[in-house]
Amino acid sequence: IRNSTKKNEIHEALQKKGCSIDNLDLVEVDLLKDQGWDQAFEGVSHVLHMAATYTSKPVSTDEYMRPQLEGAQRILELSDKHNVKQLILTSSFVAVYNTTTSKTTFNEDDWSDLSTPGIADYDKSKTMAEKLCWDYIKKHNPSFSFTSLNPAGVVGPTMSNHLDVSNDFILQIVQGKVPMAPKFHLGYVHVEDVALAHVNAIDNPKVSGERIILFESDLWFQQVGQILFEEGFKKAPTKEMANWIVRMIGLFDKSLKLLIPYLGKERKCNSQKAQELLGMYTKTSKQAFIESAKSVS
């Protein structure tokens, strides 16, 4: 973990879910520093590299890039050094769908184009970090097997009082702080299916050397609002916001500004590989939004 003060929060969250923590060891490490990593890797046979910087608050490009790129490089080298059997990277669908073309349906062969106008720093960093990993595998041919999992928008109930970016946004929706729905389209997957996909990938020979998108279904933001409205969250937006309004408000609101390059653009996916190799999906995106809303309200 990156902050030892969160140990109790992690323990409590797991215990509430009925999980035993008897065999759980938490070691504080920093993606940008060497200390502590060799200790953390002692006796480790499988690595799930899930850590990434993501925030709705303004941060510099460097604050996104360095942890992603240096962190990925560090994990690769440590996995090699400590004879790890398997490394699973949590990448993202954002490393897939950014394009300068009119393409709307994507698969694992697609890569985000870093020259896409308006591409977010987070999207760039995830794309570059994943490419770094695949390049390392090709160049060094390490003994460990490598798999990249690329989830779409991850949504679902929170396990603690700490709200991540997704759940904080859901809270704003149910509180009526988002009065209208921007014409924004994205794929989603339930957080529990993302966790299950990682577990199902461990020691699974079918996923070695594979890039797998986790994408249960796609929704327009207005559809998300309608789902929550019908579930009793009457402050959720059901009317669509005109693109010109989003652009105008985006001059002052940085979270809306990030949506501008994607207004009106569909981003769909053929997620057959996840179904065939990992047994996805057990929950719908609709369930994910409803459970998230109930957990934060």
Which residues fall in each region the model found?
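Active-site Tyr-X1-5-Lys
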Residues: 116-146
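Alpha-helical substrate-binding/gating segment
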Residues: 170-179, 184-212, 217
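Conserved Rossmann-fold NAD(P)-dependent oxidoreductase catalytic core, especially the SDR/UDP-sugar
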Residues: 49, 58-122
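NAD(P)H-binding glycine-rich loop region in Rossmannoid oxidoreductase-like domains
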Residues: 4-8, 14-70, 78
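Mid/C-terminal beta-alpha module of Rossmann-like enzyme folds, strongest
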Residues: 197-257, 276, 285-297
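Glycine-rich "substrate-gating" loop/helix at the edge of Rossmann-like oxidoreductase active sites
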Residues: 118-121, 156-162, 179-192
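Glycine/proline-rich active-site loop of Rossmann-fold NAD(P)-dependent oxidoreductases
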Residues: 140-144, 156-168, 201-212
